């Protein structure tokens, strides 16, 4: 995976079982105009910010890692997501950060600002990398902040090209360890539409 830079944030918590705790990925937009991946990562590097993400991806695909995969970044806030659909792992609103990778995409978040192909391809590459490094990550648990947040977050906006993202996740230059069958049914339908 191409990580252009590492700029570590002090805003993280331990995962009890390291990368084995990771079950999903939460996608965010920065909701900032004209901010680069570097400026967002610099913000995360500030201890008083109290927030972070594992990765920040600029519009040009420039990727910065801010938190190690074995640590929990502070990206989801008050959130809930039942990763195994069994009422246990992640159903507790405090556990979502423990069980997810956070990826911030530099974007205004106004529903009009496009997500360039270079950025979406880089995001797919990051997710494939996480899939290789985190043995319990399930691609069906790649979701956005709106799906897990309990306080009305709206990222990602409807103009995010989810079908392209999932297409590039399952059609990389080298296939990932787990592919199409592991995707959620809605993503499989979108990928099928692209194939036609």
Spell out what each predicted region is.
Residues 2-5, 19, 98, 106-192:
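Basic/polar, cationic surfaces and motifs that engage anionic cell-wall
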Residues 194-196:
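Predominantly recognizes leucine-rich repeat
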């Amino acid at each position: 995976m191409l990580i252009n830079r590492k700029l570590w944030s002090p805003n993280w918590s331990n995962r009890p079982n390291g990368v084995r705790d990771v079950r999903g990925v939460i996608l965010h937009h920065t909701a900032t105009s004209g901010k680069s991946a570097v400026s967002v990562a610099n913000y995360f590097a500030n201890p008083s910010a109290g927030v972070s993400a594992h990765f920040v991806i600029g519009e040009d695909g420039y990727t910065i890692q801010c938190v190690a995969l074995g640590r929990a970044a502070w990206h989801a806030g008050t959130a809930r997501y039942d990763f195994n659909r069994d009422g246990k792992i992640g159903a507790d609103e405090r556990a979502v950060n423990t069980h997810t990778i956070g990826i911030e995409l530099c974007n205004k978040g106004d529903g009009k600002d496009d997500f360039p192909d270079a950025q979406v391809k880089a995001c797919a590459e990051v997710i494939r990398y996480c899939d290789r490094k985190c043995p319990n990550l399930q691609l069906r648990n790649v979701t956005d902040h709106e799906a897990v947040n309990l306080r009305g977050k709206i990222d990602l906006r409807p103009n995010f090209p989810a079908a392209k993202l999932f297409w590039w996740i399952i059609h990389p230059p080298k296939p990932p360890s787990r592919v199409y069958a592991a995707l959620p049914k809605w993503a499989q339908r979108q990928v099928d539409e692209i194939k036609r």
